[in-house]
């Protein structure tokens, strides 16, 4: 079984819920027949290993050379850390960073935590893309901080509510490891 298939199985077991009736309320307020809470996998050791490997491989496949990888806390945090860890093991370190939902009210009041400097090339990541709203918030914060966005990579694209298109309208390419089609038949 491939690493990708293993990840799909883990998500099915730990993070995916389906109902014939649209009973799940999404962040957008829309009701859906299916729901993913990927934290059940992104914070689970076997999931961490698989996500780190698959995301790192995707970065290599796309021939990207980021200094950092991160996104809006907290969905992106374990993904960024798993990629950073994998990148170190493979001899090509990529720093993890986290975009705060609101800058701290004390200290340096940084909107981004990590070792990024203005001008650094980065990848913005997301756990689940639905409308693209949280990804766009991260993109805006990253750009305001002066980082250069190479692309967006999502763990899962729900392929609805124009999420991918909304993100691409910000002028960045969007890729995903998985889509809803990996979990339900159309």
In which residue ranges do the predicted regions lie?
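PRPP-dependent phosphoribosyltransferase catalytic core
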Residues: 2-13, 139-186
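Phosphate/pyrophosphate-binding loops at sites that engage ATP/ADP/AMP, CoA/4′-phosphopantetheine
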Residues: 55-67, 139-145
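Short glycine-rich phosphate-binding loop at a beta-alpha junction
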Residues: 64-75, 153-154
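Active-site-facing substrate-recognition patch
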Residues: 1-62
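Short, glycine/charge-rich flexible loops or terminal/linker lids adjacent to PRPP-binding catalytic cores
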Residues: 35, 80-123, 133-136
């Amino acid at each position: 079984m491939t690493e990708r298939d293993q990840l799909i199985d883990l998500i099915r077991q730990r993070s995916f819920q389906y109902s014939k009736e649209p009973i799940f309320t999404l962040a957008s307020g829309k009701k859906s027949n299916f729901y993913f809470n990927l934290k059940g996998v992104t914070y689970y050791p076997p999931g961490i290993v698989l996500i780190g490997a698959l995301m790192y491989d995707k970065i290599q496949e796309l021939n990207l050379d980021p200094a950092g990888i991160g996104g809006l806390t907290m969905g992106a945090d374990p993904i960024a850390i798993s990629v950073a860890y994998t990148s170190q093991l493979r001899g090509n370190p990529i720093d993890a960073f986290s975009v705060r939902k609101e800058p701290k009210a004390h200290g340096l009041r940084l909107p981004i935590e990590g070792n990024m400097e203005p001008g650094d090339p980065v990848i913005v990541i997301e756990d689940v893309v639905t409308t693209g709203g949280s990804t766009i918030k991260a993109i805006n914060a990253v750009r305001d901080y002066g980082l250069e966005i190479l692309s967006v990579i999502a763990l899962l694209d729900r392929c609805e509510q124009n999420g991918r298109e909304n993100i691409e309208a910000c002028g960045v390419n969007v890729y995903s490891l998985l889509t809803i089609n990996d979990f339900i038949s159309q």
